[in-house]
Amino acid sequence: MAIQTQLPCDGDGVCMRCQVNPPSEETLTCGTCVTPWHVSCLLPESLASSTGDWECPDCSGVVVPSAAPGTGISGPESSGSVLVTAIRAIQADVTLTEAEKAKKRQRLMSGGGDDGVDDEEKKKLEIFCSICIQLPERPVTTPCGHNFCLKCFEKWAVGQGKLTCMICRSKIPRHVAKNPRINLALVSAIRLANVTKCSGEATAAKVHHIIRNQDRPDKAFTTERAVKTGKANAASGKFFVTIPRDHFGPIPAANDVTRNQGVLVGESWEDRQECRQWGVHFPHVAGIAGQAAVGAQSVALSGGYDDDEDHGEWFLYTGSGGRDLSGNKRVNKIQSSDQAFKNMNEALRLSCKMGYPVRVVRSWKEKRSAYAPAEGVRYDGVYRIEKCWSNVGVQGLHKMCRYLFVRCDNEPAPWTSDEHGDRPRPLPDVPELENATDLFVRKESPSWGFDEAEGRWKWMKSPPVSRMALDTEERKKNKRAKKGNNAMKARLLKEFSCQICRKVLSLPVTTPCAHNFCKACLEAKFAGITQLRDRSNGVRKLRAKKNIMTCPCCTTDLSEFLQNPQVNREMMEIIENFKKSEEEAEVAESSNISEEEGEEESEPPTKKIKMDKNSVGGTSLSA
């Protein structure tokens, strides 16, 4: 028994069986493939399933016997049934939007199959010339919003004289065909796509000289890349403690994986490089270790400023900056400008406000101090900054940032014979405070204080949570990734920004002069301006004059284009993909930060510290 032939309507709405264009009330639309069918040409067996969403004979797989010769209509066990199953699976996928379902159905019906083309392949196919079906070379965008290669467009519009779009058959203005303009925003998008593609291919990668901590020697060493001999270009040796760079306070035994005793007061090292390996003071040149938004963790007394005064249990420390280090100068003793409370100086002031403990190391280079070691670098315990101010330095020309450090450690100082550590003591009298400016004295209770019940110094508030990864290479990797995300965002804002609102394009339209605007911004720019201007004054009747609507970026007349501006859909998809990737990256970054911070967190103040110039504070080192 043969199968009866049943044919749908074509793209123009004409029935392919009776060659009649039926009205809409005489057609049925399939709920699966969305194809119209002429009711009069359908067999009664096909209309029997009209309850709910009607399915056409091709999708339902209904076999109608007939005496006619066999045709190619599929039965329930043929490939047509497989096609219907695939279409139904697409329709049942709740993760897809209607537009994505339509694309998948179209690709399936055209023979491409629902092979699950990955997102990267989709992105590659988003921009293509409608003539050569390749990435546009010097892309040109027509007023109807379709993109072509410059050569293809010239061959189509100028060489063949066709002034209609190949895709939508919209009319192309003669001035656009005669003088096409390259869309620079699409050029940047294509270049960025090519760079991303090349970065994923196997190429000669840049060599990164990475040595893991466990593979480093015990002492600082020089590599083959060192320019100078000695320790001028030396690399750091192995780190013996497991603390992050922004760790506050003493280094406990739990972080000493080698000796299980922590770093004790009075320990000495040969130089700053070895001191760095034990985490007491990480910078091997700078005297202050800290961050302006977090606080200062440690300082080094090494004779850098003549203004420093060392009295053992307390000392006056000078901030950094104000010296000309241009010309690759590492040290300059002459003060050339005022110091300001920013960067490292701001970190010290924040530690003063919050009452954080600051580790102090003294170097043999401090020749004017009786408490400095004879050789090497020595750890002298933790101090607390009680006051900070500005005052003219000993050179008599420029202001210096000054800090009062007072010792508050549970271990005795190296220069004393005491068996116990420090106790709260009165603050010393500092004569230079009489002429000080920008004086700040902590009023609130400090984070590091003395517990009378336990008789020792400890954290009275939760210590600041570390914001740095322990692994140096992991920290560098995160920094590079964040820098790359910022660069991507900056490029997105620059290349795909509206020329009116300066924001990322929303519903982008490309003018005949190849400028890109938000559709709403461009329409609002010329809102209320009619196409023609009536010049009749009641006495004389003149012809209506055309209003010139000049492009906001050039002198091109956009009056004809503004009659029906078309959105550049391909560019809009590119922008949406960029935004989606940015949102995913931000969510991933925020989740990583939340995992590192944990449940308890003590945030430093985010607002700028307000200085109380009239307050001189208490006269004792409070607990």
UniProtKB/Swiss-Prot annotation:
A zinc finger (PHD-type) spans 12-62. Residues 258-407 form the YDG domain. SUPFAM superfamilies: FYVE/PHD zinc finger, PUA domain-like, RING/U-box. It catalyses: S-ubiquitinyl-[E2 ubiquitin-conjugating enzyme]-L-cysteine + [acceptor protein]-L-lysine = [E2 ubiquitin-conjugating enzyme]-L-cysteine + N(6)-ubiquitinyl-[acceptor protein]-L-lysine. A zinc finger (RING-type) spans 129-169, 498-555. Residues 594-603 have a biased composition (Acidic residues). Disruption phenotype: Decreased DNA methylation primarily at CpG sites in genic regions, as well as repeated sequences in heterochromatic regions. Released transcriptional silencing at heterochromatin regions. Ectopic CpHpH methylation in the 5S rRNA genes against a background of CpG hypomethylation. The keyword Metal-binding applies. Expressed in inflorescences. Transmembrane segments: none annotated. PROSITE patterns: YDG (PS51015), ZF_PHD_1 (PS01359), ZF_RING_1 (PS00518), ZF_RING_2 (PS50089). It is found in: Nucleus. Gene3D superfamilies: SRA-YDG (2.30.280.10), Zinc/RING finger domain, C3HC4 (zinc finger) (3.30.40.10). Keywords: Chromatin regulator, DNA-binding, Metal-binding, Nucleus, Repeat, Transferase, Ubl conjugation pathway, Zinc, Zinc-finger. One of its GO terms (cellular component) is nucleus. The RING fingers are required for ubiquitin ligase activity. The YDG domain mediates the interaction with histone H3. This is E3 ubiquitin-protein ligase ORTHRUS 5. The gene is ORTH5.
